[in-house]
């Protein structure tokens, strides 16, 4: 009897093991397909994760700005951070809301804050993975040299839907990074 029960439950356990990651993939694809498209300015670096490969550790200048928490919220509450494209074409945090809106991602207020306090918002994207070959080329071309600033402006294309934000694409100098690599490599080298 015990063995029969195990044999009956085993397929259910296997199905659940596949269902959870599959649901996450489907949700992410839905956000990429139907979400609000915006671009955020980046402060990139290109570290290496031995187990996962090359990625950009994402840091956003927008995270350094302070915002006032709306009335009626306290630590532990979920608010919605509204991103809108500015005149520069980049996404900026325009307001914090207690209700979900288009172009807003969910953010949980740390416990030590209450309504009226000023807070900095951490955008919940920390890494953008790249194919190894592309990452090495970008690292060589984009790196700081002799205390110079980077040679390109980097932005991250994101999609937002139902309070979730996902990374979609990396842009360098206003173009998708693969186009930028192709164009940058086709330019003749300048002599010193």
Question: How should these model regions be labeled?
Answer:
Residues 82, 91-96, 107-192:
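Extracytoplasmic/periplasmic terminal helices and flexible tails
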Residues 35-37, 55-57, 76-78, 88, ...:
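Extracytoplasmic
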Residues 44, 54, 62, 85-87, ...:
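A mature extracytoplasmic/lumenal domain signature
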Residues 50-51, 64-75, 89-94, 165-167:
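Short, Lys/Arg- and Gly-enriched loop/turn segments at beta-strand edges
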Residues 6, 55, 59, 64, ...:
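Cell-surface/extracellular proteins and modules involved
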Residues 5-24:
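Hydrophobic membrane-insertion alpha-helices, especially the h-region
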Residues 18-40:
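Aromatic-capped interface at the extracytoplasmic side
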Residues 39-71:
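Short extracytoplasmic
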């Amino acid at each position: 009897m015990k063995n029969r029960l195990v044999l009956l439950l085993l397929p259910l356990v296997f199905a659940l093991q596949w269902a959870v990651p599959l649901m996450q993939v489907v949700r992410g694809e839905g956000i990429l397909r139907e979400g609000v498209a915006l671009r955020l300015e980046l402060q990139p670096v290109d570290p290496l994760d031995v187990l996962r490969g090359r990625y950009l550790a994402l840091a956003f200048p927008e995270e350094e700005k302070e915002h006032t928490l709306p009335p009626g919220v306290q630590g532990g509450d979920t608010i919605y951070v509204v991103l809108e494209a500015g005149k520069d074409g980049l996404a900026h945090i325009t307001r914090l809301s207690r209700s979900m809106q288009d172009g807003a991602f969910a953010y949980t207020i740390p416990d030590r804050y209450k309504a009226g306090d000023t807070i900095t918002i951490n955008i919940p994207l920390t890494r953008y993975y790249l194919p190894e070959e592309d990452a090495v080329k970008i690292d060589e071309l984009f790196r700081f040299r002799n205390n110079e600033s980077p040679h390109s402006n980097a932005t991250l294309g994101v999609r937002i839907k139902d309070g979730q934000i996902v990374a979609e694409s990396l842009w360098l100098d206003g173009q998708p990074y693969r186009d930028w690599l192709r164009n940058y490599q086709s330019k003749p080298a300048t002599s010193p």
